[in-house]
């Protein structure tokens, strides 16, 4: 059976992907920091193996991965610091965002890649963002991490393509997750939900479809965005 290891699996897209892959027959290891959330996830899908771990803790990750053969790695863990002008950001918030969103994904990938390359198979996915491909105010460091993830995924793909290991970047925009709930004020949330939003399950279904493709089909990146409201005249 195919084994998938997913970080940031306690909420949002990560949780949806864990459930969807479990339903599709994968052995799923769901990693996250909240033991309570992991317990809830396992109660909903008893076949999922919960892994309580901080993705920035190298020794803990090495211990967790020591006895697991991973076919699919989904680097989904991420945070968004408080919205605001870069000049006003706290240094601690900058450090934490870089560590969780970028360094942890690179570290985990480095720990898993050797076994995939040795087997000449595997699939690594990264949760990117539209913010990594377009400029938005008040999220400079978050955008930098997502742009870096995009670049890393592309370069990693070039490194690994001769070995048959595939790499896919997930570019999602305006997804209804707790992350957005946490950072937006009431007015911003109202504006966001007045238009259509992508659901975590939508992203999860795409991931299952991409992973089901034959070895000769390589989805290097997929974008999933909401359809925008249409005016009575038919223009967007």
Language-model segment annotations:
Residues 10-11:
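Conserved glycine-rich cofactor-binding loop
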Residues 51-63, 91:
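The beta1-alpha1 cofactor-binding region of Rossmann-like NAD(H)/NADP(H)-dependent oxidoreductases
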Residues 84-86, 93-95:
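Substrate-binding pocket helix/loop in short-chain dehydrogenase/reductase
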Residues 109, 145:
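Active-site helix of classical SDR
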Residues 114, 158-159:
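Alpha-helical segment proximal to the catalytic Tyr-Lys
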Residues 129:
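Residue(s) in the substrate-gating loop at a strand-loop-helix junction
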Residues 169-170, 186, 190-232:
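C-terminal helical subdomain
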């Amino acid at each position: 059976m195919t084994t998938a290891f997913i970080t940031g699996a306690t909420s949002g897209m990560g949780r949806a992907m864990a459930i969807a892959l479990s339903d599709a027959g994968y052995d799923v290891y769901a990693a996250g920091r909240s033991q309570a959330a992991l317990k809830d996830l396992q109660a909903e899908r008893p076949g999922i193996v919960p892994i309580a771990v901080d993705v920035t803790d190298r020794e803990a990750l090495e211990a967790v991965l020591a006895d697991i053969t991973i076919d699919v790695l989904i680097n989904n863990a991420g945070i968004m610091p408080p919205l605001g002008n870069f000049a006003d950001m706290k240094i601690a918030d900058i450090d934490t965002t870089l560590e969780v969103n970028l360094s942890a994904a690179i570290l985990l990938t480095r720990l898993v890649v050797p076994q995939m390359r040795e087997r000449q198979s595997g699939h690594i996915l990264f949760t990117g963002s539209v913010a990594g491909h377009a400029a938005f105010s008040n999220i400079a460091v978050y955008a930098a991490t997502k742009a870096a993830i995009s670049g890393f995924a592309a370069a990693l793909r070039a490194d690994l393509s001769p070995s048959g290991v595939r790499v896919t970047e997930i570019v999602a925009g305006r997804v209804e997750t707790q992350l957005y709930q946490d950072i937006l004020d009431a007015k911003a949330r109202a504006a966001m939900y007045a238009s259509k939003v992508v659901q975590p399950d939508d992203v999860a279904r795409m991931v299952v479809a991409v992973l089901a493709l034959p070895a000769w089909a390589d989805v290097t990146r997929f974008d999933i965005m909401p359809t925008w409201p249409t005016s009575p005249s038919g223009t967007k």
